[in-house]
């Protein structure tokens, strides 16, 4: 086997940390790891690209606008709760949906985007003024994306095969399958094997806004390319300087940042078969755990990245931008912390001997069901944008019944 020095080298650690391969499933399937490393050397243009705005604004808003212009109908605030099969267990027969909110009278369709400095952006909360229940959602601080929300749905719908759909393209991530696809799992050994063997993990992240720029924080290589660094101490083993996004944000001149730091890492997950969505405090408990992790990181560990932000007394909290001008660690309340524990938010791992259990887009075992996403057998077997794009193309190929090559789904040699 490899020596301890090799196992703890930057390259090996980077490969494991990049796909959050830690906790109880700290393995990385050897063939996939080797192929991914080789594919990384096959990049086009650059090894990685920096988005010029948030991912929702750079990727999903344009996707939405293009699809909208092409006639796709969107139904927002509709949550899939169950995928039902026909009596023969061969087709998806019904899709049960919870209607979380409805549009105000006179509004024909929900417009999800709002303008920030001329850029169509996704908001962090619903645009309440368009919703009949908008004021109640706002007053109660409801997060409709949370599976633990106490919110009472506005209604229900059941989509019926032959009336509402013919083909189903299932793009909801694997983490939600134990919740919404119980009938599929019970009817198919292949689905049961996929759900049991393709593991997931929750993730945690922070975004910090600093008054000083990168040089002021003490990073010694500030004159070079803004850093994307890793691996480092878990769980926050990576750091991306995203200060180029400041121009996309709206800050008062008297209280604006000069540096933005992003980091993310794994978090202990819940067993999907034991989820109890009646515990409405679960998201707060998870977020408190993230806050504790960030507080720990901003102690001694952060000194390596931001030496000038630390003194003998500890982290210099007054360097964090805070419009409320809080004291000490209270300034963390004005930063962005996130615990990704919702079933669809769980990251897909590439544990040893797991890829063989992934299903291809058109080999679900059900005649009218296709699946897509970075969690299927798309040829990459790694949770990433590239895998999701390849899977989307594979699904389109299956729907169109065409035969065309998709770059990345197969080895080039």
Map each language-model feature to its residues.
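Short, conserved active-site loop motifs that form the nucleotide-linked donor/cofactor pocket
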Residues: 72-73, 369
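A recognition module on extended beta-rich or small alphabeta surfaces enriched in W/G with H and D/E
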Residues: 102-133
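Patatin-like phospholipase A catalytic core
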Residues: 3-23, 76, 81-82, 298-310, ...
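A conserved short coil-to-beta-strand element within the FAD-binding core of flavoproteins
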Residues: 76-103, 135, 139-143
């Amino acid at each position: 086997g490899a020596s301890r020095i090799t196992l703890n080298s930057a390259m090996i650690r980077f490969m494991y940390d990049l796909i959050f391969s830690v906790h109880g499933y700290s393995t990385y399937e050897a063939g996939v790891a080797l192929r991914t490393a080789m594919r990384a050397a096959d990049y086009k243009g650059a090894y990685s690209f920096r988005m010029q705005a948030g991912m929702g604004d750079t990727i999903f808003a344009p996707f939405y606008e293009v699809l909208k212009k092409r006639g796709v109908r969107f139904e927002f605030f509709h949550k899939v709760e169950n995928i039902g099969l026909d009596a023969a267990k061969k087709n998806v027969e019904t899709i049960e949906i919870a209607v979380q909110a409805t549009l105000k009278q006179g509004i024909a369709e929900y417009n999800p985007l709002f303008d920030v400095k001329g850029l169509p952006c996704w908001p962090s909360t619903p645009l309440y003024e368009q919703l009949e229940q908008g004021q109640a959602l706002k007053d109660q601080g409801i997060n409709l994306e949370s599976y633990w929300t106490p919110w009472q749905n506005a209604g229900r719908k059941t989509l019926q095969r032959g009336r509402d759909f013919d083909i189903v393209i299932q793009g909801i991530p694997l983490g939600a399958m134990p919740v919404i696809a119980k009938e599929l799992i019970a009817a198919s050994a292949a689905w049961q094997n996929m759900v049991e063997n393709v593991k997931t993990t929750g993730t945690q992240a922070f975004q910090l806004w600093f008054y000083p720029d990168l040089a002021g924080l003490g990073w010694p290589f500030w004159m070079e390319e803004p850093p994307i660094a890793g691996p480092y101490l878990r769980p926050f083993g990576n750091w991306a300087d995203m200060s180029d996004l400041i121009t996309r944000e709206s800050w008062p001149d008297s209280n604006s940042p000069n540096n933005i730091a992003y980091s993310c890492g794994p978090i202990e997950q819940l067993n999907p078969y034991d989820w109890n969505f009646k515990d409405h405090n679960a998201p707060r408990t998870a977020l408190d755990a993230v806050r504790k992790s960030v507080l720990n990181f901003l102690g001694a560990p952060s000194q390596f990245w931001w030496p000038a932000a630390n003194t003998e007394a500890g982290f210099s909290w007054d360097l964090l931008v805070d419009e409320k001008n809080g004291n000490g660690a209270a300034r963390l309340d004005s930063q962005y912390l996130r615990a990704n524990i919702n079933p669809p938010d769980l990251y897909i791992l590439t544990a040893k001997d797991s890829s063989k259990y992934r299903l291809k887009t058109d080999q679900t075992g059900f005649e009218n069901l296709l699946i897509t996403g970075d969690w299927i057998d798309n040829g990459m077997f790694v949770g990433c944008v590239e895998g999701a794009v390849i899977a989307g193309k594979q699904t389109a190929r299956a729907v169109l019944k065409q035969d065309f090559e998709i770059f990345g789904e197969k080895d080039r040699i």
